[in-house]
């Protein structure tokens, strides 16, 4: 233990405060302890490991059927009913057959039931991920030589016409598309599992909420644009790469005259019904114990009308086509394709992880329990790794379905088993009944599901008033998603977020503090009235960390606010230059901090102060450049007869100052007691006492 400065209290003696340093522990000892804890083999350790990897084995033993079962069954049935039409619809986004969406929904629910730590999150197909998967699938299909104007829901897609390069493949379009999707999914899952094993769950925190909202907005516009051709029944090429949204709109305008009247009428009716039902459901949700299964009702009615009205034969309306039943045999994803999509999987893994962890934490906070971010990464990763061998594509947590689970009384992840059972029933028996379902109806389901994300644009003005930097991140991410690509939008959002963070730390708020009346508290003299400046002492606050990027701004701020360029004046004194005085009044409070003024005094009497106190409470950390800056500043002030004191330093900052040579070398060295203080008031009182002693000594001499 080393003795820290003793704060002086008015009317009382000094209160001894001692800091207890933690026992030094090297990297070797720390790794040895972690390995010993992790690798020790016993029945209890194995049981704890299994329970950590499969949380269901822990909470199932505490399950209370009388309290939980009714809510879990109800929410599971509702989610299962919603999953079926969404799975069929989202296959349009992924460019795959509907059967693969059903596979994905089935296996993802079962795996997350075993491995997830959230009680309310619904994991399965997600529109944004389906869009990203579809973009990669379309690109690889085009590179393989398939006709990009065809899509996987078109009857006869497996026997579609190939050009020269595609003729070398051993399967058709749909077969190759699912191979690409499974390779992408396996790589995505491997990245997520690796992040979970390496305890990188904190990485998702760097994808801020404005970034995710802007990404959702931009991707939703891209999804909406991709579905317009199905709403209108227009056959246009599927554009890829930068400018896809703009090129698609131009193609739609050129082909608007070829719109299918039957699809337009169907889309108009379905959109009106779905939007009206959603608005009414949102308005009266407090009266509805169970959300209305509007999507399922619309799909059932539309399928019956299409079947008995023979809309495909009479009007050429596009339909879903054959949807097989049962399960296909497992297949190992191709390593060659995994190499091609490895980079695409990085963006997919980050987006899925960020949405899954943020949703899990959101529902955990609102319902009073905790989740483990690293286990969520493992769970979502396994929801991608294992199903990749079973003809599934990438999944993550979905907000809309998770909200429905909560609203319908979900208590545990047992509801996911009920949802998987509903999907299994469709897979085994009911899938062929959707043969005559129009694709325009599926597009309507997708478009209506984007309401929440598209409405986020109305949050932009409020976000701008609250934080312009966050608003720029939101707008930049959304614009890049729409004008370039979703992957580029994610990258742009991350870069803008990092630049925003760097900008805030590079030029933090600075101020000179003054005393609040006769109290021991100090505040910004420009923000509050009636504050009393301390004569002969300048109290400076730097509202951020001190590191290599802002050390020059730190010095400029300090010199400008105090009216004394200590570095310049100390150099002039060393060179034997002439004295210069401080301008009357010094710099105005709050004016722009440009080049440091050279009008300064060489002695404290001319400068108007004898001590500078730096309030280090906002100083989160220092690096080597920051410590060097403080050392140079102390030397320059010392050359002018001015003292430099630090107040409110946190223990980590004290340690950095000690290791950097700013303080004395030995424990208990008086240098620390002379320079570091527990409060600003202690530093000011000590500075005034020292100055009085110095004046008394000079007078005596």
UniProtKB/Swiss-Prot annotation:
Expressed most abundantly in the kidney and liver, with lower levels in the pancreas, testis, brain, small intestine, colon, and lung. Residues 1-20 are annotated as: Disordered. It is found in: Cell membrane; Basolateral cell membrane. Keywords: Anion exchange, Antiport, Cell membrane, Disease variant, Glycoprotein, Ion channel, Ion transport, Membrane, Transmembrane, Transmembrane helix, Transport. Changing residue 237 to L: Found in a patient with chronic kidney disease and hyposulfatemia; uncertain significance; decreased sulfate transport when expressed in Xenopus laevis oocytes. Changing residue 515 to C: Found in a patient with chronic kidney disease and hyposulfatemia; uncertain significance. Residues 527-687 form the STAS domain. One of its GO terms (cellular component) is membrane. GO terms for biological process: chloride transmembrane transport; chloride transport; oxalate transport; sulfate transmembrane transport. The chain crosses the membrane at residues 68-90, 94-116, 176-198, 255-277, 290-309, 342-364, 377-399, 412-434, 472-494. This is Sulfate anion transporter 1. The gene is SLC26A1.
